[in-house]
């Protein structure tokens, strides 16, 4: 065990055999080309499957659509960032000079959380990483209130409105990215060809900007008499 990471291992509930995997998982691209991005990709898939499986087994009467909404809620940025902070990951993130001050940035915390999962998977096996993930998520999963999944995010709600009215889904694209790496502002444009609508909004991440864009389009559809059918 590397001494400076012994406390972190205890917090994670996992001891790395190959600590270089953990270093890679904590390293932002601003520091070096050997960063967490590939591990993040792997961890995202592992996490999504583990959460999907536990929800499938725990909520046996829940329909597929509701399971998808609940999984989305559990693996979205805010939840991952909160878990990363509770596990003190922000204290160990390795950033380059251009990203100093970004330890608390939600997108970075989200990415590192997924990267650490990917690193644990490569360092051990699926059964082990699943056990670790479920330990981290236990307080959240045990307190799930099924009523909360009735609340859809704006993109999902917009999608349902359009599909219910036999309209094609909007196309989202990034128009601009402004600001320094740790305080970027994304401008996203959503286009509905069927309705000849073009809407834009800003957010501190692409996901947030897309949600705000969807909110605006929902408001415009409402003015035209298009609402979600219950």
UniProtKB/Swiss-Prot annotation:
The keyword RNA-binding applies. It holds the Pfam family dsrm. It is found in: Cytoplasm. The active site is at residues 44, 114. InterPro entries: dsRBD_dom (IPR014720), RNase_III (IPR011907), RNase_III_dom (IPR000999), RNase_III_sf (IPR036389). Keywords: Cytoplasm, Endonuclease, Hydrolase, Magnesium, Metal-binding, mRNA processing, Nuclease, RNA-binding, rRNA processing, rRNA-binding, tRNA processing. PANTHER family: RIBONUCLEASE 3, RIBONUCLEASE III. NCBIfam families: RNaseIII (TIGR02191). This is Ribonuclease 3. It comes from Francisella tularensis subsp. tularensis (strain SCHU S4 / Schu 4). The lineage of its organism: Bacteria, Pseudomonadati, Pseudomonadota, Gammaproteobacteria, Thiotrichales.
């Amino acid at each position: 065990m590397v001494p400076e990471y012994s406390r972190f291992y205890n917090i994670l509930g996992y001891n790395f055999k190959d600590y270089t995997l953990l270093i890679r998982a904590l390293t932002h691209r601003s520091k070096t080309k050997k960063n967490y991005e590939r591990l993040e990709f792997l961890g995202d898939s592992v996490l999504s499957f583990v959460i999907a499986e536990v929800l499938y087994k725990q909520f046996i009467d829940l329909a597929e659509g509701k399971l998808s909404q609940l999984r989305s809620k559990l693996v979205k940025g805010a939840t991952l960032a909160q878990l990363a902070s509770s596990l003190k990951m922000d204290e160990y993130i390795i950033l380059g000079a251009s990203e100093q001050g970004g330890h608390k940035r939600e997108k970075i915390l989200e990415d590192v959380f997924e990267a650490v999962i990917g690193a644990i998977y490569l360092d051990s096996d699926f059964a082990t990483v699943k056990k670790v993930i479920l330990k981290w998520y236990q307080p959240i999963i045990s307190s799930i209130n099924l009523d909360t999944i009735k609340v859809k995010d704006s993109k999902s709600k917009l999608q349902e409105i359009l599909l219910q009215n036999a309209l094609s889904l909007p196309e989202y694209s990034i128009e601009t990215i402004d600001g320094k790496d740790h305080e970027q502002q994304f401008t996203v444009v959503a286009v509905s060809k069927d309705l000849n609508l073009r809407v834009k909004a800003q957010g501190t991440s692409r996901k947030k900007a897309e949600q705000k864009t969807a909110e605006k389009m929902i408001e415009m559809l409402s003015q035209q008499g298009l609402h979600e059918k219950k």
